[in-house]
């Protein structure tokens, strides 16, 4: 049985098609009934993942093909979710690197591939989308080889098999000129090149928990790969946590994977990836083992957080109107629940009972958490993301990121100038000969906060930007990436009126239209100059009975700017907050009245 088992992780950059590839592998292996209605993008299970087209949580699926059982674990591509990636690598024996036949390998793939090499895994490279116009598979293979060399791959890892595929059409082949009619070459490559798990079948049971799931019916579900021995329902086991404390428990159900379903099994053997219920409170990296042989496996390491922000109770005048959960206790309970499976997250209580400091791997990591909370009915206010400085050998250090930008040549100058002002160092410049340039930078993380939206405007939406955490290094002196413009602040509470907004359009760009509810201290637009301006957007037109009301010109408003959560977080300054509720995202000053703001500006800065 063990010789027929294969465990493999899939690595791919956002939008290179790994989720579609898994769909097709499932359909063609007969794991899904071909007549059954197949759901698209099966691996991206939560709404946020489907909307953004990114994978956040690592997920498992299993395929049966010609008596072989292939466990496939999907990995998140973003370094922000590096905590997930670490754990996946401890469960598999090889990685499937999916690369777009036009784009080539991207920095996010680099991050995950580096982790895979550190675990000594050998890759299989899948060049996907070979049918797309402009595909250049040979160039991509060279790029992948160069990437592997840069990551210090061993000779064995550099001798990798290549499979060409078009996941959308469900075909693969060993040569991009000569494709088979289905995915068989890819299944064959997995079976031939992935080693069977190197495990001890006869020893006492031992496994490490590398993922957690929660189900209100059975409680916490621990997922991991059995290192040695066998496990069956109702077996007595001992659990060792990361501090070495032990406790006894009884296994409830043992669930294996088939397709996307979890199916109950009576016996699971070493090498297989299973889910176990009934073990009570579990943590990532706990070891579950036989009661007679209590041996802990080495703990899984997870990268430290690099960005933090404050989650505060919503104190605006509209507090409680739109959300169900608004108190500090509810917010803290929700954050503690998130800590159970989100291992790269840290939550600290502050002196202020209504504010919590939440640290994570990056802006994306934290904004995904905020978006999830908002959908669950929470109301909260969040501050601007700040990077976490460290003291190393008496020197203050800050995080740096590798950034890859792909821009049209006409925008190259302005982008390079902007990154120069944000203290970025150009490492590599690579024109593709077709009017686009790829730029590689190393830049302090704080220089990137707020840069994405500016970059999109600069390149008229045609630029691509990817970043991954690189390392900690000495702090560069000076401020980075401060907002140039001031803001327009409402001076009262009520409904915004078109007549008043029309008069404000010359002052800057507005965030809201006619009829929107506003309150004092809410930011309603960007000022065209660098200072903040308190304005009145509530006054209607004075009507007299001297004139017919129809003779005046119609008021025409420019459509307002609608900000997403990420854009709002990038936009705000240190004295501002983003108010997040289930139905709206508003930006406000930390001090709502003008008197309070003046008083705060006079107070000495304690930074």
Curated annotation (Swiss-Prot):
Post-translational note: Very poorly to not phosphorylated on tyrosine. Phosphorylation in vitro is strongly activated by proteins present in pathogenic strain E2348/69 / EPEC / MAR001 but not non-pathogenic strain K12 / DH5 alpha. Phosphorylation in vitro increases GTPase activity.
Region entry Domain V, spans: 386-482
Region ranges (Domain III): 303-385
Induction or repression: Induced about 2-fold at 18 degrees Celsius (at protein level). Basally expressed at 37 degrees Celsius, 3.5-fold induced after shift to 20 degrees Celsius, maximal expression is seen at 2 hours (at protein level). No increase in expression when cells are grown at 43 degrees Celsius or when engineered to produce increased levels of the stress second messenger ppGpp. Expression at low temperatures is activated by CRP.
Signal peptide positions (record): none
Family: Belongs to the TRAFAC class translation factor GTPase superfamily. Classic translation factor GTPase family. BipA subfamily.
Subcellular location: Cytoplasm
NCBIfam families listed in its UniProt record: PRK10218.1, small_GTP, TypA_BipA
Region of interest: Domain I (or G domain), required for chaperone activity: 1-202
Stored SUPFAM superfamilies: EF-G C-terminal domain-like, P-loop containing nucleoside triphosphate hydrolases, Translation proteins
Residues engaged in binding GTP: 15-20, 128-131, 166-168
The organism of origin for this protein: Escherichia coli (strain K12)
Keyword terms, alphabetized: Chaperone, Cytoplasm, GTP-binding, Hydrolase, Nucleotide-binding, Ribosome biogenesis, RNA-binding, rRNA-binding, tRNA-binding
Residue ranges, annotated region (Domain II (or beta barrel domain)): 203-320
Annotated InterPro entries: BipA, BipA_C, BipA_GTP-bd_dom, BipA_II, BipA_III, BipA_V, EFG_III/V, EFG_V-like
A GO cellular component entry from the record: cytosol
Domain tr-type G, chain residue ranges per copy: 3-198
Phenotype seen when the gene is deleted: Decreased extracellular K5 polysaccharide production at 37 degrees Celsius, increased extracellular K5 polysaccharide production at 20 degrees Celsius. Cold-sensitive growth (20 degrees Celsius); cells have a long lag phase and double more slowly. Decreased capsule synthesis. Cold sensitive growth and decreased capsule synthesis are suppressed by an rluC deletion.
Primary location class: cytoplasm
The protein, known as: Large ribosomal subunit assembly factor BipA
Annotated function: A 50S ribosomal subunit assembly protein with GTPase and nucleotide-independent chaperone activity, required for 50S subunit assembly at low temperatures, may also play a role in translation. Genetic and deletion evidence suggests this is involved in ribosome assembly at low temperatures; it may also affect translation. Involved in incorporation of ribosomal protein uL6 into precursor 44S ribosomal particles at low temperatures. Also has chaperone activity which does not require nucleotides.
Catalytic activity: GTP + H2O = GDP + phosphate + H(+)
C-terminal domain (CTD), binds A-site tRNA: annotated segments: 483-607
A single BP term in Gene Ontology: response to cold
Assembly, per entry: Monomer. Binds between the 30S and 50S ribosomal subunits, in a similar position as ribosome-bound EF-G; it contacts proteins bL12 (L7/12), uL11, uS2, 16S and 23S rRNA and the A-site tRNA. Binding to the ribosome alters its conformation.
């Amino acid at each position: 049985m063990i010789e027929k088992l294969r465990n493999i992780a899939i690595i791919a950059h956002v939008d290179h098609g790994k989720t579609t590839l898994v769909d097709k592998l499932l359909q063609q292996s007969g794991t899904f009934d071909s007549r059954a209605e197949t759901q698209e993008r099966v691996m991206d299970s939560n709404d946020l993942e489907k909307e953004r087209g990114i994978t956040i949580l690592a997920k498992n699926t299993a395929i049966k093909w010609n008596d072989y059982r292939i466990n496939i674990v999907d990995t998140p591509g973003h370094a922000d979710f590096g905590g997930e990636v670490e754990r996946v690598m401890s469960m598999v024996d090889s990685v499937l690197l999916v690369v777009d036949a036009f784009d080539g390998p991207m920095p996010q793939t680099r991050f995950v591939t580096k982790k895979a090499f550190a675990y000594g895994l050998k890759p299989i490279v899948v060049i996907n989308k070979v049918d797309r116009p402009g595909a250049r598979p040979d160039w991509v293979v060279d790029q992948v080889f160069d990437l592997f060399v840069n990551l210090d791959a061993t000779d064995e890892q550099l001798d990798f098999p290549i499979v060409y595929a078009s996941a959308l059409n469900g075909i693969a082949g060993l040569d991009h000129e000569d494709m088979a009619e289905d995915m068989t070459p890819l299944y064959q490559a997995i079976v031939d090149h992935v080693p069977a798990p190197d495990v001890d079948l006869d020893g006492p049971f031992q496994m490490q928990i590398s993922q957690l799931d929660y189900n209100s019916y059975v409680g916490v579900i621990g997922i991991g790969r059995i290192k040695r021995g066998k496990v069956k329902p109702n077996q007595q086991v001992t659990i060792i946590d990361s501090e070495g404390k032990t406790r006894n428990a009884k296994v409830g159900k043992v669930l294996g994977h088939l397709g996307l379903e979890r199916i109950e099994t009576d016996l699971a053997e070493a090498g297989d990836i299973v889910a176990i219920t009934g073990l009570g409170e579990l943590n990532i990296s706990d070891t579950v083992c036989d009661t007679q042989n209590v041996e802990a496996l080495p703990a899984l390491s997870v990268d430290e957080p690099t960005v933090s922000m404050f989650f505060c109770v919503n104190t605006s005048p509209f507090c409680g109107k739109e959300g169900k959960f608004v108190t500090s206790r509810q917010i803290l309970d929700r954050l503690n629940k998130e800590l159970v499976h989100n291992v790269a997250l840290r939550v600290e209580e502050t002196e202020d009972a209504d504010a919590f400091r939440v640290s994570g791997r990056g802006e994306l990591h934290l904004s995904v958490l905020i978006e999830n909370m908002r959908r669950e009915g929470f109301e909260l206010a969040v501050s601007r993301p700040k990077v976490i400085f460290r003291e190393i050998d008496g020197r203050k250090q800050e995080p740096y990121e590798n950034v890859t930008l792909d821009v049209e040549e006409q925008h190259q100058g302005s982008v390079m100038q902007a990154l120069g002002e944000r203290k970025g160092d150009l490492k590599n410049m690579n024109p593709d000969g077709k009017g686009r340039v790829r730029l590689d930078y190393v830049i302090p993380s704080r220089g990137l906060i707020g840069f994405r939206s500016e970059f999109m405007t600069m390149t008229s939406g045609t630029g691509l930007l990817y970043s991954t955490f690189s390392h900690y290094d000495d702090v560069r002196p000076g401020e980075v990436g401060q907002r140039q413009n001031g803001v327009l602040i409402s001076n009262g509470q009520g409904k915004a009126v078109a007549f008043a907004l029309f008069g404000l359009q010359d002052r800057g760009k507005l965030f809201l239209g006619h009829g929107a509810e506003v309150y004092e201290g809410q930011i309603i637009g960007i000022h065209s100059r660098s200072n903040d301006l308190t304005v009145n957007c509530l006054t209607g037109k004075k009507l007299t009975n001297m004139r017919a009301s129809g003779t005046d010109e119609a008021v025409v408003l420019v459509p307002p700017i609608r900000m997403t959560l990420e854009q709002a977080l990038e936009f705000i300054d240190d004295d501002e907050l983003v108010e997040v509720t289930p139905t709206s995202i508003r930006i406000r000053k930390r001090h709502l009245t003008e008197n309070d703001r003046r008083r705060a500006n006079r107070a000495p800065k304690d930074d």
